[in-house]
A protein has these predicted regions:
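Extreme N-terminal starter segment of soluble prokaryotic enzymes
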Residues: 1-4
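N-terminal strand-loop element at the rim of the active site
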Residues: 7-15, 24-70, 93-94
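Glycine-centered tight-turn and secondary-structure capping sites
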Residues: 19-20
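Functional cleft and adjacent loop/helix regions within the main domain
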Residues: 71-75
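Short N-terminal targeting/anchoring amphipathic segment
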Residues: 76-94
Length: 95
């Protein structure tokens, strides 16, 4: 079973500056029996990230479109190529 997790846009998935969602995702994924098939998508400027299958999304800066939409559109493109059995979204009710 492949699982994809999309963190909130401004959430850092880094041990040096992690938010509550990152800590929760890190702690639960580390003990999951699916941890090898779980991919975490997020946006951080920190080079040191938690030691899991993390994919950093760096949206293009476009003054005519929000970075949140760029961020989600990148995730959707990735999902169309590499489909997941389960998608977990955190803190983005407007999507």
């Amino acid at each position: 079973m492949k699982i994809s997790i999309l963190l909130p846009f401004k959430e850092n998935f880094s041990p040096s500056y992690a938010g509550a969602v990152s800590l929760f995702v890190n702690d639960t994924t580390r003990i999951s029996k699916y941890k090898n098939n779980t991919f975490i998508y997020g946006n951080t400027n920190y080079k040191d990230t938690f030691k899991l299958n993390y994919i950093n999304i760096e949206p293009k800066i476009n003054f005519l479109q929000s970075q949140n939409k760029e961020y989600v559109n990148y995730f959707i493109k990735e999902e169309k190529i590499n489909k997941s059995d389960l998608i977990e979204l955190h803190n983005r009710p407007i999507y």
